[in-house]
Each structure stands twice: as C-alpha cells, then as structure tokens.
Amino acid sequence: MGSYKYMETILIPAFILLLSLNYVMPCNLTVNFYDKTCPKALASIKRSVWAAVASNPRNAALLVRLHFHDCFVQGCDASLLLEGAGSEKASPANDGVLGYEVIDAVKAAVERVCRGVVSCADILAVAARDATVAVRGPSWTVRLGRRDSTTSNAAEAVTDLPRGNMNLNQLIDNFRRKGLNAREMVALSGLMCFFVLPLYY
C-alpha cells in the first residue's frame, strides 16, 4: 500500500504534465462538452473501463499507453485507431501496443447510449483517466471536444514516438521536439512502472 502512496507523488505531476501538453489540446475543449448531447457518456466509459480493469488489471496500463501513443503522433486525435496500410496502427513503432479491443468495447458501450456523438479521441482520453483511477491512481479533469483525425501516418509514428534503442540524448531531443524537457521526459517514461510492476508483485 505504501508503494502506491509513494507512486502518487510521482504520478500526479506526470499526469498533470501529460494533460497540459498544449500541442495536443485545442483551446476550445470543455469539461461539459457532452452534457447536452450525451449526458451518460462519461458514466458509460467509466463502467466499461472499470469492468475491463477488473477482469485484467493490465488493461489499465494498456489504455494509458494507447493514449500516450495517440497523443505523441499528430496530437490526441485517435489517429492511432485508424486501420489500413500506412496507418499509425500498422507502423512498426506501434507493434507492441495492445488494448485496442478494450477501446472497441468502450466505444460500443458509448454508441449504445448515444450513437455517433462522442469522439474516439475523447474516449481514449477519458479511458486513460478512468483506468488510472481504477488501479488507485490519481484522477484529473478531462476537457472534452476533441475531433477524430481522418488521417494516420505510419512514418510519423516511427519518427515521433520514443524508441527503446534511443540513447539519452536522442530521448531528450525526441521529447524536446514535443515541448517537453528532460525532467518531464523522465516522469512520462517512468509512468508505466506504476502500472506494470505491481502486477508482478
């Protein structure tokens, strides 16, 4: 239990940082974007995400990783979810990314509540938050109103996403191009430890 408390002191700044990335968030986002058009959307997302995490706690990490990979290429626009040759999803940079079926199930649940209203980009953002809360991580306010991309580029995923074989200077440069400094890079890079390590102990 103590390790969770310790991790919260690291996670809260990391998530605030992730959410404050100006390059991925348009100015017109609001917390009440779906209040009139789909008032049950957030409850539906939460229910689906919590069920997925209850069935397999690893799903929390998968959802956060999906959101990170989506936001790091073209911004938080759900371009990672687009399929086809030459798409981000098909890029070698996203070979190890899992959890698409969880997002598909969440999207299906939202569509049953209000068809064609809630963007996949917003579903990814809210699902990452709800998954974090489901494993006793911090919560934060998610501003809504993102639009889904109609384009996806595998080459951009290769050039934009940090890779495991990058040295320190390359990683710092990679994050710097996204407006992040070395300290912020460490916070975001270490974020997955919170999700993955407790599953092994």
Question: Where do the model's predicted regions map?
Answer:
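Folded extracytoplasmic luminal domains of secretory or organellar precursors
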Residues: 2-201
